[in-house]
Amino acid sequence: HSLSKTRYYLYFYDGRRSRIARNVIEVQDGGEENGVFSANMYAYLEDLSNYYQCKLLYHGTMRRGDTFVNFNFENQNNKVERAFLYAIHSFSNGGRMEGLCCCLSTQPILPACFKFLLSSEILEETEELKEKLKVSKEDIRLLKKMNMFVISDHV
């Protein structure tokens, strides 16, 4: 029997290109082992309906808890590069999860961390979404106070 897949749409704001970056994460349903699911991330998509035409492909895992979900991915073109995503799993925001991704930026090559929004449905790419994905004054205030980048508000 074939396993079904759950698809998530991941959005973040890429300040280098001044636009929202589109990504798709596919999670293998029913294939979990000790709460760990197999997952793929198709990164930097022009067209969400044709996500096999991605600029970067990652293979990895997803772990789901009561309040958080995390993904651990390995870049298939550069095995040294990994992406770790942590999202707040809230039931009150219509299938959307806000989180942080830590990875290696390619241009320039530096460790990086950015906010993202994960949705079970395709989102309209509005100015409101763009502002939500950008680093806010509150994000900077908390960064200075706590000396760490944290997600301060919920979707």
Predicted ranges, named:
Residues 1-49, 57:
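Helix-turn-helix/homeodomain-like alpha-helical modules used for DNA recognition
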Residues 51-155:
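C-terminal regulatory/effector modules of DNA-binding transcriptional regulators
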